[in-house]
UniProtKB/Swiss-Prot annotation:
Highest classification ranks of the organism: Bacteria, Pseudomonadati, Aquificota, Aquificia, Aquificales
Spans through the membrane: none
MF terms in GO: methylthioribulose 1-phosphate dehydratase activity; zinc ion binding
EC number annotated for this UniProt entry: 4.2.1.109
UniProt-recorded name of the protein: Methylthioribulose-1-phosphate dehydratase
Length: 215
């Protein structure tokens, strides 16, 4: 049965996404209109707000956000196009308890995803920042999944869904970027910041040591 989204719900989502995207744009994480972010509005049926395609994320306009269903189709009439990777967001919402998803392209996450691609994951341990990912274990060791950057976006979404590690709120796409999520916008932002801190540290250590075996 269709669920009616109220204007207040939609405006809240727009405000949240615009606030996050401008903050992360100012950190250089949305270059050349790349990346996307979304905010879940309803579980069953799944409805979420997502940034529209091809927009400069350093500015705020009335055409920045579109509302879609689990099949990445707009739930209301619009001339806007949802992000090309909307189906990946849908997979994350359907397979996790995420309430917000952030996808960014940076030099650090591209470097790390390419270097560790053949392993299928990025190994991370012995770092205090792991706690920022809600992983509170002594001697914590995590594996951030990496998948191929498939041109076919349906296949990309399918592989992303199959590769999600429920214990790790992030997924890398080789030479593309990272998806990070959280139960709300605060968690999602914290998680993507933690991943980027970790990847920057790893990249610097790899260059310094001359090998990827840094832990």
């Amino acid at each position: 049965m269709p669920y009616r989204l109220y204007q207040e719900e939609k405006q809240k989502a727009v405000n949240i996404l615009n606030d996050i995207k401008v903050k992360l744009y100012n950190r250089g994480w949305f270059p050349a209109t790349s990346g996307n972010l979304s905010y879940k509005l309803h579980d069953d049926p799944l409805y979420f707000a997502i940034t529209s395609s091809g927009k400069d994320k350093g500015t705020v306009t009335h055409e920045d956000v579109i509302f879609v269903d689990k099949d990445a189709k707009p739930i209301e009439k619009t001339k806007l196009k949802p992000s090309a990777e909307t189906k990946v967001h849908s997979q994350i919402y359907q397979r996790t308890d995420a309430g917000c998803v952030i996808h960014i392209h940076t030099v650090n996450n591209n470097f790390i995803s390419q270097l560790y691609f053949e392993d299928g994951y990025v190994p991370i341990k012995d770092m205090e920042m792991i706690k920022a990912l809600d992983i509170w274990k002594e001697d914590a060791f995590i594996k951030v999944p990496i998948i191929e950057n498939f041109f076919d976006l349906d296949r990309l979404a399918e592989e992303a869904g199959k590769s999600i590690n429920p214990e790790v709120p992030g997924l890398l796409i080789r030479n593309h970027g990272i998806y990070a999520w959280g139960r709300d916008e605060f968690e999602a932002k914290r998680h993507v910041e933690a991943f980027e801190f970790i990847f920057e540290y790893m990249r610097n250590m790899i260059i310094f040591k001359g090998c990827k075996d840094i832990f």
